[in-house]
Amino acid sequence: MATRVYMHTLGCPKNRVDSEVMLGTLAEAGYRLVQDPAKAEVIVVNTCGFIESAKEESVEAIVELADQKREGRCRKLVVTGCLVQRHAEELARELPEVDHFLGTGAYQDVARIVSDAQAKRLVVPDPDFVHSAATPRVNSLPSHTAYLKIAEGCDNACAFCIIPKLRGGQRSRPIDDLVAEAAALAAQGTVELSLVAQDLTAYGQDLPGKVRLHHLLPELAKVDGLRWIRLHYAYPRDVPDALVAAMADEPKIVKYLDMPLQHSSDRLLRAMKRGRDSVFLRDLLARLRARIPGLALRTALIVGLPGETEADFEDLLRFVEEQRFERLGVFEYSPEEGTPAAEMADQVPDALKRERRDRIMAVQQGISRAHQQAMIGRRLEVLVEGRAEETEHLLAGRHAQQAPEIDGLTYVNDGVAYPGEIVTVEITDAAEYDLVGRVVARDPSRAARPLPAAPRPPPPRRKGGLNVLG
């Protein structure tokens, strides 16, 4: 009987792709993949080491899953990822129950190390691995959606960020290799492709021939079967007109852009070493919205960088009120050893960081509510995910401006559809992050296939002020 392996992934979508590559490598080597750690002889934990809270979550997961080795059928516990790349020796001392530690440059070796009784306990080479279309990969999301990692590493030197030390420098994948992987995913049923990288807009700067992201996008759009292509982790420093035009003119590129801006105060932007000032950021946002009407912008901000004054924070708060981002997340600055920001004077107290985060999110909640209310009455294309977790009486899906895993959902309380089907939904209700609607049109080729309607719902209930059952 094949040895069973369970993968536990923490962190970002880029980490998820790494886990999928490891799963593919293990499956090709004959291992059987399972969803329950209690059934696995091998457990792999792919960690995140970006900020302190992520490191704590990773260690907690390792300790919890180590119970399976003491009390269950697990015979080998393997820990991989960014936390290992950064703290391998310390982890090895503190976690004797772990059999192997693999850094970010050793993902391709996971099957060999798991099967080799003589393999080293610490395998932490330079972080120079990048997978290709030929690398085995198992998509861990529903087959209709997938991530495509177009590059690995980062050449930026943001003062607060440890990622270049964990992932190495920028390494872009060739266009033909990315198209081949996208086509393989589409052949498996993927209709939504989310492009990710540490710095998406730096794509191609390390490749010969002056290849850039705006050259890649039209080639991906030619892949049969793909319907939606979305962009994540765009660095604002390098968004040329050609890229904006490609996003505006190609129908498969959804009107959604994830672009972390981090701050608006010029003093803080200089301290962060972001390379652009607030005038540039405002001009860029205006250019994007003018050229791509209806664009939904997601951004990430940092509060509490050392030296952030109340005036700096008020500048950021005004920026949020002014720009009215459709989606926004806020991180409390986490001092990371080995980064310039960790050595800066005037560290901000944790309580003040939390207060500033909460103030921004309170403002954003009202902005988000207004954006959502404006959706009522509109007809949107919705990618159906399946039955809602809350109740079988609802379908759950996402419209083109709701990214997987990080944004809200669109609940369907009237009509039927298949997981992976894109249907037209009329929006009937809205809350801060989620929408409710009814199916008003389906692709005739899909609608012809029989699917039982959901059971009639019980009396209406509300979710955060949202009447999800109509």
UniProtKB/Swiss-Prot annotation:
Residue segments, region Disordered: 444-470
Domain TRAM: 373-441
Reactions catalysed, as given in the entry: L-aspartate(89)-[ribosomal protein uS12]-hydrogen + (sulfur carrier)-SH + AH2 + 2 S-adenosyl-L-methionine = 3-methylsulfanyl-L-aspartate(89)-[ribosomal protein uS12]-hydrogen + (sulfur carrier)-H + 5'-deoxyadenosine + L-methionine + A + S-adenosyl-L-homocysteine + 2 H(+)
The protein's enzyme class: transferase
Keyword Iron-sulfur: yes
Residues involved in [4Fe-4S] cluster 2 binding: C154, C158, C161
Record Pfam families: Radical_SAM, TRAM_2, UPF0004
PROSITE patterns, A to Z: MTTASE_N, MTTASE_RADICAL, RADICAL_SAM, TRAM
Binding site residues for [4Fe-4S] cluster 1: C12, C48, C82
EC assignment: 2.8.4.4
SS bond list: none
Major subcellular site: cytoplasm
NCBIfam families (UniProt xref): 30S ribosomal protein S12 methylthiotransferase RimO, MiaB/RimO family radical SAM methylthiotransferase
Protein name: Ribosomal protein uS12 methylthiotransferase RimO
